Regions:
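Vicinal oxygen chelate
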Residues: 2, 66-67, 73-85, 89-92, 112-120, 162-183, 202-206, ...
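N-terminal beta-strand motif that seeds the catalytic metal site of vicinal oxygen chelate
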Residues: 99-124, 168-169, 219-224
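Iron-associated oxidoreductase/ferritin-like identity signal
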Residues: 125, 133, 149-156, 162, ...
Length: 224
């Protein structure tokens, strides 16, 4: 079983990448993720049985998205403590099964999208968004789709703005080795670099009409 170097039941993204057999996997904003391309829906669906077998053996509860183009396997974040230690053994088992089925890993397709709702310090808008979207609370400040199909929401206060105004931007979590290319593509498409002081953890971009997007890679590299 994969274990963290600290001997706990949890590990960081950096620790998970050091495990054997997990080269196909990247850690996004919703946890470890791998994408395997397929030739058809039936080809992609053949990975389900090995995933279920690994789930029953290791106790990892994945989210699996099967499409004609391929299959996405995610190990969703269920705790702020980090990635479950058993996740690396699960990931290696899934990757081995995918290779045997001639499914092709493509880490460049891994990503997750989050919505960052910046609220005035005197406001609490999380209940409104939870009610409107049918979401449930996740931790003290976030909200999630109960089936983890929609983007995760994060709520954090801002100061200096009038209470009547809210500001929201998208967080795009991508593999660390894909982040710069994604930033460059967005800038080429007319975007503006608003702030790169936190790079390579994340870059803040603005669209031509000033909508905000953060391209974030820190989830794929963080360590304790």
């Amino acid at each position: 079983m994969g274990e963290s170097t600290s001997g706990s039941d949890w590990m960081s993204a950096a620790e998970s990448h050091r495990a054997r057999g997990v080269a196909d996997w990247r850690v996004t904003g919703t946890g470890p993720q791998a994408v395997f391309t397929a030739t058809s829906l039936s080809h992609a669906a053949r990975l389900i049985a090995p995933v279920v077998a690994a789930t029953e053996r290791l106790g990892i509860l994945p989210d699996v998205d099967v499409r004609p183009e391929g299959v996405v396997v995610r190990i969703p974040s269920r705790s702020s403590a980090g990635i479950p230690a058993a996740a690396t053994e699960f990931a290696a088992a899934v990757s081995q099964a995918a290779a045997e089925l001639l499914l092709t890993a493509d880490p460049s397709l891994a990503q997750s999208i989050g919505i960052y709702v910046a609220q005035h310090s005197q406001a609490d808008v999380r209940p409104f968004f939870m009610a409107a979207l049918g979401y449930e609370a996740f931790g003290d400040t976030d909200a999630v789709d109960p089936l983890r199909c929609g983007p995760q929401l994060a709520f954090n206060p801002i100061t200096g703005d009038p209470p009547a105004r809210g500001r929201t931007h998208l967080d795009i979590f991508v593999p660390a080795d894909q982040a710069q290319a994604r930033v460059d593509a967005a800038l080429t498409a007319g975007g503006r670099l608003a702030d790169d002081s936190h790079a390579p953890a994340w870059w803040s971009l603005a669209s031509p009409d000033n909508h905000g997007i953060d391209i974030a890679a820190w989830t794929d590299t963080w360590s304790r």
